[in-house]
């Protein structure tokens, strides 16, 4: 970690993911001009319609520029495993890490031959069990709980996938787990935050150092998480029509190959790079997963007390392999 004295914050200088190393350098110099042949890959706006970010491919040799208006400019040389960051004044450390640990790592993994999935995962009974889903579906919370109840932490938020000899492997992710402060407290993850974690800020998550399971694991299941509203909320909404107790049970339903393929596409961690080579590799991998790996919808109560039942349901489901 490197301390930026002007901002009094700690920033990572090395990220390790999927057995690869990404070196990070921070600079105060003005970013160099974009090469003339740069290709704009993505442009996003915030909720107010203002420009939020832009991604460019600056060469065909694994060079990218990510410009985030609330963080800074990140020039990635994926082939050489290094990124140069020019940060904005008074930038939030959380904003910097969101870019580094999310889109920067996703581009880096793509150039290293991995397909990044927006998922968290554990190693359970020697196999990779992954959890995808919309923001707020509970991916990180579930992995945090499972990691303290018999499973081994594999990754949080970004799962590097690679196919080898017909087998899909889930590789270790970044050695960090990030939780919303209320979730961290309820799950008992307290007193272990990394230095520089600012859970008091609304935008910041509590960050916990975790050592991922060291070896890639064969992907046994990919669960699409869907939280059922808490009992109190359901009681209010179901008063007039009567509540169904079965609605609050853990439910696992396997998707057909077409549904699974579409769900995987929605869960990609990078939909910006659309070169023919990348799209061909992605489509082939997701089609193979949809045919050979069970992709299931997992519905469970939005209640931390239900997590033991979730683990039991997963263990029973894995016995069907």
Show the residue positions of the predicted features:
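Glycine-rich, often acidic-flanked micro-motifs
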Residues: 2-21, 120, 124-134, 148-321
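A short, compositionally biased micro-patch
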Residues: 69, 78, 146, 154-156
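Short charge-dense sequence patches
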Residues: 45-60, 90-96, 224, 237, ...
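Long, basic/Gly/Ser/Thr-rich N-terminal segments
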Residues: 1-91, 312-321
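Short, surface-exposed beta-strand/loop "edge" segments at domain boundaries and coil↔beta transitions
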Residues: 31-32, 70-76, 91-95, 177-179, ...
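Post-Walker A alpha-helix
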Residues: 142-143
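Extreme N-terminal, non-catalytic leader segments
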Residues: 67-128
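Conserved glycine(s) of the Walker
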Residues: 137-138
